[in-house]
């Protein structure tokens, strides 16, 4: 939940910084889909989205879209780094398990959102910059692998 909230707040923050009005919109369809995935091996947490009001071109749209996955990548990276630092002192503890879970969930959120399928963030980032899309996609894949096999 933390990763989802920070992800959406990042979209809103960047949109406002770029001069647009942004508001979180609750979407009952996505909330229902999220609820249904609790019974599946993979989870989807998407109860809404940030609606951006204004004339948003591909560059602005891509930068706003990149903010969410970038935040998830940073949270995953910080959590993995903290896990590595603490595990060398304390071994496997509940704190380390929590940090590894946070790293995994945020890497998963970043990777899922970077899929180049509309309406996901990846399609907007790719429409703006293939290079930036590749950086974010590869970073999320690497972090997901590290969080599983560390």
Language-model region placement:
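Hydrophobic transmembrane alpha-helices and their immediate loop junctions
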Residues: 1-150
């Amino acid at each position: 939940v933390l990763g989802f909230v920070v992800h959406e707040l990042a979209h809103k923050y960047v949109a406002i910084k770029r001069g647009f009005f942004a508001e979180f919109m609750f979407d009952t369809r996505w909330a229902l889909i999220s609820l249904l995935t609790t019974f599946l091996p993979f989870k989807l947490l998407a109860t809404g989205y940030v609606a951006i009001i204004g004339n948003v071109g591909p560059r602005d749209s891509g930068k706003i879209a990149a903010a969410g996955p970038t935040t998830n990548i940073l949270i995953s990276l910080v959590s993995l780094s903290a896990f590595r630092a603490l595990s060398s002192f304390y071994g496997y503890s509940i704190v380390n398990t929590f940090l590894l879970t946070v790293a995994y969930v945020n890497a998963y959120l970043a990777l899922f959102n970077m899929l180049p399928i509309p309406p996901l963030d990846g399609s907007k980032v790719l429409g703006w910059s293939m290079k930036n899309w590749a950086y974010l996609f590869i970073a999320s894949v690497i972090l997901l692998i590290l969080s599983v096999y560390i």
